Amino acid sequence: MEIDPQLPIPLYFQLKTLLVEEILSGRYDLEKRLPTEHELCHRFEISRTPVTRALTELADEGVILRHRRRGSFVNPHWLSRRPDQPEIRAIVPAEGPWARMVRDAAGPGNQISVVEVPGHTLHHTLRHAVAEGQAPDVALLDNVWVPEFAAAGFIYALEELNEQWVHDEHEVDFLAPLVRVNRYDGKTFGVSPFADVAGLWYRRDALGALGLDPPLTWADLRLVGRAFADAGVPSPIVMPGGSRAHEATAYFLIAFLASNGVQVLGPEGVMLGSAATAQALRFLRSLVEDGLVPLDVVGYEWNQTVRLLAEGRAALSFGGSYEGEALADALGVPHPEVWDHFGFTHVPAGPRGAPASVAGGMMFAVFRQADQPGLAMRLLERVVEPEALARFARSSGRTPSRRSAIELVAPDAPFLSRTAELLETAASRPWLPSYPRVSAQLQAMLEAVLTGRLGPTAAAQRTADMIGAITGRPVVAEPEPVVVAAAAV
């Protein structure tokens, strides 16, 4: 088939149809890159506009996978399974050790197909796969999505697949905070391989050179930031500051709000429309106004802050404990040596709160559309075996989710005690099916305040109202201050 400009069919649709036919015919190797936009323009003698639209729609429909700086590839999960070859299909984020963990657990005797997607597209990819009836057998997802995916019936309760393993191993050996976040409506819907917390990274050498300690309060944070600014550090303090960083922004912001005693949701309803929220936002805006945080943070991607820290262009970086692996890679050192150069601590305390952190992490889940749910469950069990978790913890610096794995790693891992300490008192992200939309509102709130588009009080109240509408929960109003009349003389 060739493209005919004389036909009354749009060029992009002709190209899209042709590419689908070539994919189905086996023309393209699954491991090799598809032709680039430039190559397709040259081959069919058409402009770039229809080529771009054809590839974009194929990606949106899950036919192809697009990777930044690598190109486009056929999505092997879009193709029909072969009935003569039982295969486990998995989707994991491209960032991190996940694909290697799954392949190692599968072993050489099992057929497995692992698709890696950019982390910020993972939620959309999984929902789209379910909608198309092409969900994987196993996937790694943010554990805060458990309520959404479980309530929608997307994933199995693991008790349905191997209740004994859940009772004998998951509930006994896994860290209690992770057991809790993997549960919904009294059932377990996934297993976390590692524990993560939100906090503050700092450069030990930079603090030491100025004779400073890690900040314990917001006032300390400002003083330390000013000292680094005076010393010529280009961006003394950095943070994920907008929607381009996706969940990383909400993760940081929830921890920062907690440091001033603020919960997004409380037992009575939405708690954001408070003076404490406005105070936290006002402080963050003041850091931008004082030149201690660059306004560019509103456009940062999720991993940009840790890159600036590694390069010495920032001295303090709000983020997650999982970023230790990226720091090790940037420095070119084994992970244990990261702690010789960097420290990780709580978010400093605000005037109305205490030092804070937020628990997070990823979890493996089995989808109800799984072609091989039993095999998928056995794969999941092997992925989180103590020896496997210990091996990846040593290379990545992450904290294993199992006590038995921690015992194997502890002698070689100085990071474990610090992460475990933060985890003990960590707050949680809002636990409800509509969390992704709540997260988007939090990201928009911070971005609006940092850019000056909305004032702190207006942004807090607007976001509280939006989250109230999303969740159906009432917005809790702060009580009016009581004015005591002067006694008559």
Predicted feature descriptions by range:
Residues 43, 47-145, 466-489:
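Conserved N-terminal structural module of periplasmic/extracytoplasmic solute-binding proteins
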Residues 144-197:
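Hinge/lid segment of periplasmic solute-binding proteins
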Residues 189, 222-270:
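Extracytoplasmic/periplasmic solute-binding protein
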Residues 225, 267-298:
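Glycine-centered hinge/linker elements that transmit conformational signals in sensory
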Residues 285-371, 487-488:
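Extracytoplasmic/periplasmic substrate-binding proteins
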Residues 396, 414-471:
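C-terminal capping/gating helix-and-loop segments adjacent to ligand/active sites or protein-protein/ligand interfaces
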Residues 329-332, 362-436:
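Mature extracytoplasmic/periplasmic domains
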Residues 1-43:
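Extreme N-terminal segment that seeds HTH/winged-HTH DNA-binding domains in transcriptional regulators
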